[in-house]
Amino acid sequence: MGSGGRGVRRVSDPSKVARAVAEVMRGQPGPTVVQGYLSEADDGEKRIFWVDGHIVGGYLRRRAPGAFHHNLQRGGQPEATVISESDRTICDAIAPHLRRNGIAIAGLDIIGSALVECNTLNPGGVHYAESFRDSNSMGATECPIASQVIRMLTTVPTWKLPEANPA
């Protein structure tokens, strides 16, 4: 899958979806995802940071004027956001799956009330979430995100890695 919005397209005409998918697949080998457009995307996309079972912060990404992508590499702008009860419900629902698969750090992308992406290798933007920490519902008394990540990486995990499948 791409990153930074590479390969992401908006196709309004249903008769052109197959052609758009074929073009993406030619340019990027590997899995391709096709999903319906969420009208809530017009309000932005939240990146919520999840560390070892806990939400530790987040921020909102808004599109550049006239753009389709929320990605910061494509002109999107970060803003402070509130971590809502709906966001917490989504994160709680995905948490068992993340833990079962040995994932301890994730950037969860949410549009409206839908989880649209789970970034586990390098969930970018922690510094934005850190800078907006006092503005969201996490509060100024919460431990900084980077400190929580470091603490999680340097302590005994509360979860087990999945067992490898024998080949």
Question: Where would I find each of the regions flagged by the language model?
Answer:
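Phosphate-binding site of ATP-dependent enzymes
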Residues: 6-90, 94-98
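Short, basic, helix/turn surface patches
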Residues: 1-5, 27, 137
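Glycine-rich beta-alpha junction loops
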Residues: 1-3, 38-41, 62-63, 112-114, ...
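Short acidic (Asp/Glu) and glycine-rich catalytic loops that position anionic groups and cofactors
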Residues: 1-2, 69-75, 119-125
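ATP-dependent carboxylate activation and anion-phosphoryl transfer catalytic cores
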Residues: 82-167
